[in-house]
Amino acid sequence: GNSVLSGFNVEFLAHSLNTKEDTAKRLRSPQDERGQIVKVEDGLHIISPELQEEEEQSHSQRKEEEEEEQEQRHRKHSKKEDEDEDEEEEEEREQRHRKHSEKEEEDEDEPRSYETRRKWKKHTAEKKRESHGQGEEEEELEKEEEEEEEIQRQHSKGRKNGLEETICSAKIRENIARPSRGDLYNSGAGRISTVNSLTLPILRNLRLSAEYVLLYRNGIYAPHWNINANSLLYVIRGEGRVRIVNSEGNKVFDDKVSLGQLVVVPQNFVVAQQAGNEEGFEYVVFKTNDRAAVSHVNQVFRATPGEVLANAFGLRHSQVAQIKSNGNRGPLVQPQSQ
């Protein structure tokens, strides 16, 4: 059966993974006809480090012991603390009650909201008019209402256009080509910079992100794929080769691209780029997700247990060690021939 790497030639795959060509051949076309669903004769086991299990067990035991000790200490002190707290709360309640009762006798509480204050003042003014007449009280009430409206306008002025002000003041420009801005770097291969909604929040509204890639001469951006986004590659300088393989291992694109050309890479299609011999290869990738996620083949291999790789691709342990332990630990690769 074919693997997803079947669409890449053996030489390029060996350079990308920094391994020998016979190992690359196994990865490209493993001698295995089992397909995607297999029957396990001796039972299925999950490969996991034993030390990790022991550490988790000891950690859980320590956690349980600490919780028991905390409960015991809590039970010892809770009774006394509850009694003290009850006494203090009772005293505070009595003090508050005395203060409130005295204040209520002197004056009624004034309402806080604008509408209720207005009604309250009208009610007070009506009482005054009944006993003292209407002239001076009405003028005083009108002045107070005008003052209240002015205060209300001042408070609402800052909130009226909050969303528009946020958008107008938002940062809309980011220079991801700046060398100090690089997220991934290989002194012999190049550098990669990304920008998404975490670094430029306005991209959340656009639902877009971008990736800037600069490959030095013969530098390789090893096979990788976008998990949650389609992408559009635009060349801004130099020339390089772009290889695209679909999820069935079939080659769908393998050609050189140069300044001003576009290449569309669908989601979950494996893509790899390599700069030419004469000059570097500089391009930007626009992605249809503001937090696009990328998986790299070489990092997936390094994270996969060696026994799984050996059984899946028919590799010897020495070949597995080449894949997992050799240089070029990031997605940017400098070919060994350089």
Curated annotation (Swiss-Prot):
Residues 18-44 have a biased composition (Basic and acidic residues). It comes from the Eukaryota. Residues 174-321 form the Cupin type-1 domain. One of its GO terms (molecular function) is nutrient reservoir activity. Pfam families: Cupin_1. Residues 82-92, 136-150 have a biased composition (Acidic residues). This is Legumin B. It comes from Pisum sativum (Garden pea).
